[in-house]
Amino acid sequence: LGTWITMIRTPAVLTLLRAAGLDFARVDMEHSPFSMETVADMAALARAMNFPLVVRPPEGNREWITRLLDAGIWNLHVPQVDTAEQAAAVAACCRYAPLGERGMYGFGPHTEYVTRPPAEHMASANARVHVTAMLETRGAFEQLDAIASVPGIDALTIGPTDLAQDLGVLGTPAQRPALDEHRRRLV
């Protein structure tokens, strides 16, 4: 059981969430004013507490993904993945060669400040990262099978509000049935 963190921009909120019995938290950088510095501090505390932290970056691009991974975030919830090509680009940014094209930064939070042989670090990092692609448009669902088959995309989910908006059902009685239908397609 987890929750989204959207308004409380202090790492200490993680201690409260864990004390409340939650198993993980998601930080929303797409629709909230979190700075990279705050998220990096949250990542450090989450690692110290052994409390899984998921981050939704503002965009699923190399810049944001690299910065979050280098800060020690292992679970990404990537928004607006509409095509298999986008999914492949996201997956490539998240993993080192030979599985991807992630840039190498040798020592920091992402290595837990442990120096080890590069091949060992790369294999460990590739195994730890978990990438969820958010499907938020009709076009994404038209490419569902292609997106789902991209190596390195570990899970799929919907972005319910954006999807409802794209389908033209946001705020109408048709919203819930339309979203339920799209959720079933992911199972």
Segments from the language model and where they lie:
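Expand to "…catalyze enediolate/carbanion chemistry for C-C bond making/breaking, isomerization
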Residues: 1-187
